[in-house]
């Protein structure tokens, strides 16, 4: 059950309950009491036979039944506290593991999120942590309690007849062999179960998020078949674990029953030969019968342990993944906003194509710079590098002459507001979404930000106003309304650097006009980087940068680039800018 690797994992898990020493101490006391009551009940039954039935001792008729009742009462109380305390400890551990895992996921580099599906990560937080918690709550209590019980009963058996006990101990190595073999089989299948659960959760997440596309393209059967394939793989691996577990327990019981039959036969002969009293026989047989139940439970818990250890291995793989590098010590203040790319090269993990190749660019402070180029030209990559979602392979990026990796990461991002075309809103109030990450803002500040983003015009018409719950990712709002809330969030943050990645693509003409008016005000005294589809969002930019396959091809104002009669001019004249930027 516990090979070296399993012990290593379990020891690491135990650190999550090491802070609850008082609760653990109480649990261990109750476990010891439970273990002691098992042989006591067997001894009392033996004494009842010898003293009450054979010797006819009048005092034993009342005393021994009372003792037996007291033992069971004490055992019942101890079992109650043992169950409650062990579950409390395990639930605390589950909370700690789940919180640490989620915190780790939030700190993982963007590249790790790109390689692992959201559904797989969700499965680790929900399913894997639960399996690990079961191993902590059930396994340690069963192993501790039943190991002590077995030792107590074994001591009783040896005391009453060490010769008979030797016969029973022969089954020990046989039982251990079957438990070890079953453990290895269940560990493999349990690991596959974790993967199947992650894949199934991923399929479910994709289906629920993209249900409109699934319906419009008539792909319901295709998606259902993919989901059923994942669910079937999970079912098959679950059945493998169940079959091994179901075979393991009765096999051990059959071996134990054979040993019991042999021992009972020999013991009866000893009673007939008057080398053992009838009471001692009852005590011995009762103790031997009692010892098989904790053996069965320990054998049965093997499946839970293996599932938990497979899940723990999966969890620790995430926890051991390096977090985002944050070695910077400099805290920015009074940011001017000059951004420089100096011979920067970058490629995404797992791809051979270079996204940026020896790229250099100066983005002037407190000016608006627009990035133009076809899909894959490197526009969004530049934005992701400025925010340090990714690290450059070569070269440096500086803000006001300070390299990004020398700036404390949280401080860097505190000075940047980011509005993406993929608006992320939360199932909370409008006010909470606008003030996201800045709970200290009062309602008036939130209202002013909403007005600046021209979001107030629809917010004030809602029955609950700023307190309106907007649904999962703002599903109760239109695309333009969701976009304006995201822009209001950027207004409220009031960072010296603003990045707008196609931020007005979801707006109608009227909404865009209102946003452009607000943006003209927001641009003052801050560095603005715009990646937009529509010409109206970049025509008035202080600087337009034309990118192509990760290289800078042209830069200048709209008038200057038109005069060059090159890439930008051709896009403009062909009327394709709105589709190719």
From Swiss-Prot:
Keyword Ubl conjugation: no
Transmembrane segments: 24-44, 61-81, 158-178, 251-271
Subcellular location: Cell inner membrane
UniProt-listed Pfam families: ABC_membrane, ABC_tran
Domain ABC transmembrane type-1: 25-307
Residues at which ATP binds: 373-380
GO cellular component, one term: plasma membrane
Domain of life: Bacteria
EC number: 7.5.2.6
GO molecular function: ABC-type oligopeptide transporter activity; ATP binding; ATP hydrolysis activity; ATPase-coupled lipid transmembrane transporter activity
Membrane topology: Multi-pass membrane protein
ABC transporter domain boundaries: 339-574
Claim: Phosphoprotein is one of the keywords in the record: no
Swiss-Prot/TrEMBL keywords: ATP-binding, Cell inner membrane, Cell membrane, Lipid transport, Membrane, Nucleotide-binding, Translocase, Transmembrane, Transmembrane helix, Transport
Chief place where the protein resides: membrane
Role summary: Involved in lipopolysaccharide (LPS) biosynthesis. Translocates lipid A-core from the inner to the outer leaflet of the inner membrane. Transmembrane domains (TMD) form a pore in the inner membrane and the ATP-binding domain (NBD) is responsible for energy generation.
Family: Belongs to the ABC transporter superfamily. Lipid exporter (TC 3.A.1.106) family.
This protein's domain notes: In MsbA the ATP-binding domain (NBD) and the transmembrane domain (TMD) are fused.
NCBIfam families in UniProt: MsbA_lipidA (TIGR02203)
Subunit-level organization: Homodimer.
Protein name: ATP-dependent lipid A-core flippase
Source species of the chain: Hydrogenovibrio crunogenus (strain DSM 25203 / XCL-2) (Thiomicrospira crunogena)
Lineage of producing organism: Bacteria, Pseudomonadati, Pseudomonadota, Gammaproteobacteria, Thiotrichales
Gene this protein is translated from: msbA
